[in-house]
């Protein structure tokens, strides 16, 4: 019996399709697949932004906006709807479930201990890791790299268009303080937001000497809307 078994042909492991499988994918089907193409070298196999590539809807980033791929002199476009999906994606179903309907942030190195019960809350937190909107005033420290000169890639941007619009309003404040000074002249302080102006009135003018109007300029009724370049939808 033993001689018959020894006569059997040996298992050709080189030609076996099973031997060519990735060991990691066999051990755990939930791990992200690794692109075996030549373009996928060792430098970006486990890059911190690889997990971005297949988030739904508004979290999809085009390759030219991926911070891991933007050079110091690359011009960042203002809009991000020219998404060019890459082959590696992360699905919401891959998130770690830590309780009944609760998931934690999947971003590598995120120190948040929050647990999210819905996709909307998770997306709102997740995109805070990627400040992909930059100030469009050329000499602002929070402007992205552009034609006016490179800025370090670590410069802080903004997670939403609304946050950027609120910041840009500081470059061109149009809300004037409505109070009068002791000489009866209009206060010259200008603000980009109504709440800041009202706080100034309360602290400095003690809510007195109003000039009869609370706002000034075209931006007063909607101070959080981007009035400098375009009216953008609230995010």
From Swiss-Prot:
Disulfide bonds listed in the record: none
InterPro entries on file: Znf_C2H2_type (IPR013087)
Record carries keyword Metal-binding: yes
Signal peptide: none
Disrupted gene: phenotype observed: Reduces markedly the expression of hepA and abolishes the production of heptelidic acid.
Keywords: Metal-binding, Nucleus, Transcription, Transcription regulation, Zinc, Zinc-finger
Positions of the UniProt region annotated as Disordered: 14-45
This protein's GO CC annotations: nucleus
An MF annotation (GO) of this entry: zinc ion binding
Subcellular location(s) per record: Nucleus
ZnF C2H2-type: positions: 175-205
Function per UniProt: Transcription factor; part of the gene cluster that mediates the biosynthesis of heptelidic acid (HA), a sesquiterpene lactone that acts as an inhibitor of glyceraldehyde-3-phosphatedehydrogenase (GAPDH) and a growth inhibitor of the salt-tolerant lactic acid bacteria in soy sauce brewing. Both hepR and hepS regulate the transcription of the heptelidic acid cluster, but they are not involved in mutual transcriptional regulation and act with different mechanisms.
Protein name: Transcription factor hepR
Source organism phylogeny: Eukaryota, Fungi, Dikarya, Ascomycota, Pezizomycotina
């Amino acid at each position: 019996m033993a001689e018959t078994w020894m006569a059997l042909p040996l298992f050709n492991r080189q030609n076996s399709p099973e031997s060519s499988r990735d060991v990691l994918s066999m051990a755990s089907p939930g791990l992200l697949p690794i692109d075996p193409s030549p373009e996928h070298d060792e430098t970006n196999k486990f890059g911190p932004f690889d997990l971005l590539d297949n988030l739904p809807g508004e979290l999809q980033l085009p390759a030219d906006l991926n911070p891991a791929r933007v050079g110091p002199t690359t011009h960042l476009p203002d809009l991000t709807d020219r998404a060019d999906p890459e082959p590696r994606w992360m699905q919401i179903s891959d998130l770690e479930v830590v309780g009944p309907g609760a998931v934690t942030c999947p971003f590598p190195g995120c120190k948040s201990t929050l647990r999210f019960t819905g996709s909307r809350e998770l997306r709102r937190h997740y995109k805070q890791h990627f400040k992909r909107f930059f100030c469009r005033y050329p000499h602002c420290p929070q402007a992205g790299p552009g034609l006016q000169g490179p800025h370090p890639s670590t410069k802080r941007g903004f997670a939403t268009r609304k946050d950027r619009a609120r910041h840009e309003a500081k470059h061109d404040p149009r809300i004037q303080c409505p109070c009068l000074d002791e000489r009866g002249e209009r206060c010259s302080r200008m603000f980009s937001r109504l709440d800041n102006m009202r706080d100034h009135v309360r602290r400095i003018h003690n809510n007195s000497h109003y000039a009869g109007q609370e706002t000034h300029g075209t931006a007063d009724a909607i101070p959080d809307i981007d009035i400098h370049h375009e009216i953008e939808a609230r995010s």
